[in-house]
């Protein structure tokens, strides 16, 4: 997943040569099936977006994109753009629609895009982020009722990261009161999120960019090299096999109670808190080494059995 960092308030964006490099190198890894373009707002770099969608399709990958829909000014303009991105090879368009985006992008623009996508048979879905005080989606979707037929809609609680960390009061967040009784397994570590500075993380969650999970940087490694680093990262392996409860159980074992005294929006929020805690991560290093030894022992046993 290539994350364009283009919004009106930042000049940072991923160089096109990096994106071309990533797409070309993706052909060496069969498990990479889809290239996603996000942001920021990728449609602010429209011609580059069209070019990279074509590039992704030319090497046999699916192409998806996320947008706030600012460009659906009229139905004719929406139809023109939908036709162009579909012709370029876009497989799915995701729209961000909620009260936060609604302050800047009118419902009429979203309606134009949904109608145009329906006419061109371009698959589209909608994602919404809510807080306690910004959860009034009924008015928005009442206006989109007809256009929403056969359009999947996903709702997620706002995470306290980025601007939300400084601009949204903690009392407005929607917390999971039962987080510690859940399995907290992670099924999201199958994506590469690539940031404008080239840093790569194994997760597309806004809360996933923590140092222990960082895989590397596209300036330093090929995608194949990053994939090897992904497979050798012990924290990623544990998240996939055991989930966050491995860390919570370990915290309880060593008497590290800090995590149990806070509230969390969801497991992504909990994940961010755990992996951002340098003291805790330092204290559990010996246990990570033990896990490495267990994995290596299993590998040796498998080799012996194969003989």
Predicted regions mapped to residue ranges:
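Short, well-ordered coil/turn segments that N-cap beta-strands
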Residues: 31-34, 59-63, 89-91, 120-123
């Amino acid at each position: 997943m290539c994350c364009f960092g283009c919004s009106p308030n930042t000049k940072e964006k991923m160089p096109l040569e990096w994106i071309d490099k990533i797409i070309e190198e993706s052909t060496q890894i069969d498990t990479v099936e889809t290239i996603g373009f996000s942001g920021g707002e990728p449609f602010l770099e429209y011609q580059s977006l069209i070019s990279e969608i074509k590039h992704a399709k030319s090497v046999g990958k699916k192409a998806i994109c996320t947008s706030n829909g600012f460009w659906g000014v009229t139905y004719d303009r929406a139809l023109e753009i939908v036709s162009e991105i579909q012709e370029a090879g876009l497989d799915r368009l995701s729209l961000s629609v909620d009260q936060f985006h609604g302050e800047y992008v009118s419902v009429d623009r979203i309606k134009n895009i949904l109608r145009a996508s329906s006419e061109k048979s371009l698959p589209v879905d909608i994602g919404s982020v809510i807080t306690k005080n910004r959860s009034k989606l009924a008015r928005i979707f009442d206006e989109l009722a007809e256009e929403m037929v056969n359009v999947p809609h996903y709702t997620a609680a706002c995470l306290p990261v980025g601007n939300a960390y400084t601009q949204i009061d903690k009392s407005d967040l929607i917390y999971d009161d039962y987080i510690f009784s859940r399995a907290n397994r992670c099924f999201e570590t199958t994506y590469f999120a690539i940031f404008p500075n080239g840093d790569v993380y194994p997760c597309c969650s806004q809360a996933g960019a923590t140092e222990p999970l960082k895989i590397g940087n596209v300036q330093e490694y090929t995608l194949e090299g990053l994939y090897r680093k992904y497979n050798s990262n012990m924290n990623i392996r544990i998240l996939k096999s055991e989930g966050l409860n491995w860390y919570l159980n370990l915290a309880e074992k060593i008497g590290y109670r800090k995590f149990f005294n806070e509230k969390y929006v969801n497991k992504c929020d909990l994940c961010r808190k755990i992996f951002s805690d340098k003291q805790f991560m330092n204290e559990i290093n010996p246990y990570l080494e033990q896990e490495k030894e267990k994995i290596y022992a299993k590998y040796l046993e498998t080799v012996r059995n194969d003989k």
